[in-house]
Amino acid sequence: MSQNVYQFIDLQRVDPPKKPLKIRKIEFVEIYEPFSEGQAKAQADRCLSCGNPYCEWKCPVHNYIPNWLKLANEGRIFEAAELSHQTNTLPEVCGRVCPQDRLCEGSCTLNDEFGAVTIGNIERYINDKAFEMGWRPDMSGVKQTGKKVAIIGAGPAGLACADVLTRNGVKAVVFDRHPEIGGLLTFGIPAFKLEKEVMTRRREIFTGMGIEFKLNTEVGRDVQLDDLLSDYDAVFLGVGTYQSMRGGLENEDADGVYAALPFLIANTKQLMGFGETRDEPFVSMEGKRVVVLGGGDTAMDCVRTSVRQGAKHVTCAYRRDEENMPGSRREVKNAREEGVEFKFNVQPLGIEVNGNGKVSGVKMVRTEMGEPDAKGRRRAEIVAGSEHIVPADAVIMAFGFRPHNMEWLAKHSVELDSQGRIIAPEGSDNAFQTSNPKIFAGGDIVRGSDLVVTAIAEGRKAADGIMNWLEV
């Protein structure tokens, strides 16, 4: 690292350049160019190597951030990748999709006055470069225990659990209903944030480590939980939350109203060459006036996907102001650049339809910000007499997700909470063990919809809980 302790003044924070707007608006490719070697080294050199690094504390997997920044600055890429993988199963993914402004970079000592270290982009650089140079996890010292665990769900929680188990000699077999690993990483997050080759490469790496994947395999249809409990020493549930939350709006089942997740999944499958399904039909927004209801990152994915499909006009409508919007500021900025219109402080009352029963608009009412709610965000209070119509040919509802019905789980004494989430306490003797001692769970199905990195953290901790229970 530099001997100049004021290097953060001499060298300002630099983000990687974005692809030109004319390309971004029509192609499903990652919009950020990767750092060059020189850029990565220089930006890593801005790190102060704080004695108590808040960036590590804020990261859900507690990455050794200053340490691998130092290695990156010195060009020791293999060592940096090795250290990165000690705490994170998917560092090249987190470097792309984590909301660093709310996590590591938001906690960087330099953030307020000098601009945070570009931690996420360096994390991406380290691991992409290491893979390109041939680095792979060293499994030569792993001793097999003879134990095997079935993992249901190849999303971030399931993959993280499989990773840790495999590195400790426990055979992991991962079942997933989709034709590729990743869960919502692959099929929910659009390619302009995470190109799908990233997860294809990951499957090859995991397979080389000894993880076995059984794709296009749905529990309850193609394989039964009874059989998994009989054939394996433990089962981990990393099934996520896929059921879209409804808005309770008049005419929300009208022709032209779509749920966010099926819309995104079908678009990605179409781009990857996979067929559509009855539950997830491909929908094109070409030439349409699109209104997306919601203010989270899923809403941002929907508006930006609609732009790339050729929508005539795209609007994001959110009931609070921009300051209280849950979506990443980076994603909001990108959407604005790509031509999305934002309407804040508007709440939907119902869907307007024409004589043929098709969407013609959204009935809205204006709101103003009131006192904070239980989560600390200011309430949206309706302004009387402010009803109005926003014209639309298509409406996408991005109100969040809840657990889907798992009939195959009911008879196995796995307790659920009032919202349908699996109860699997992190603080139990065996972390993330359910009321059925042979079944563990983690990620969104336990805590509700959350970040990719949080699911990774829970999957890794659940693996420790499984190994503790198996006494390996």
Swiss-Prot record:
Domain 4Fe-4S ferredoxin-type: from-to ranges: 38-69
EC number: 1.4.1.13
Requisite cofactors: [4Fe-4S] cluster
Pfam family, one: Pyr_redox_2
InterPro entries for the chain: 4Fe4S_Fe-S-bd, DPD_II, FAD/NAD-bd_sf, FAD/NAD-binding_dom, GltD-like, Helical_ferredxn
Coiled-coil features, chain-numbered ranges: none
Pathway(s) of this molecule: Amino-acid biosynthesis; L-glutamate biosynthesis via GLT pathway; L-glutamate from 2-oxoglutarate and L-glutamine (NADP(+) route): step 1/1; Energy metabolism; nitrogen metabolism
Transmembrane feature ranges: none
Lineage: superkingdom: Bacteria
GO terms classed as biological process: ammonia assimilation cycle; glutamate biosynthetic process; L-glutamate biosynthetic process
Catalysis performed (reactions): 2 L-glutamate + NADP(+) = L-glutamine + 2-oxoglutarate + NADPH + H(+)
Entry's cofactor comment: Binds 1 [4Fe-4S] cluster.
One term under GO cellular component: glutamate synthase complex (NADPH)
Keywords for the protein's UniProt record, in alphabetical order: 4Fe-4S, Amino-acid biosynthesis, Glutamate biosynthesis, Iron, Iron-sulfur, Metal-binding, NADP, Oxidoreductase
Binding positions ([4Fe-4S] cluster): C47, C50, C55, C59
A GO MF term: metal ion binding
Function as written in the Swiss-Prot or TrEMBL entry: Catalyzes the conversion of L-glutamine and 2-oxoglutarate into two molecules of L-glutamate.
Remarks, miscellaneous: Glutamine binds to the large subunit and transfers the amido group to 2-oxoglutarate that apparently binds to the small subunit.
Subunit annotation: Aggregate of 4 catalytic active heterodimers, consisting of a large and a small subunit.
UniProt name for this protein: Glutamate synthase [NADPH] small chain
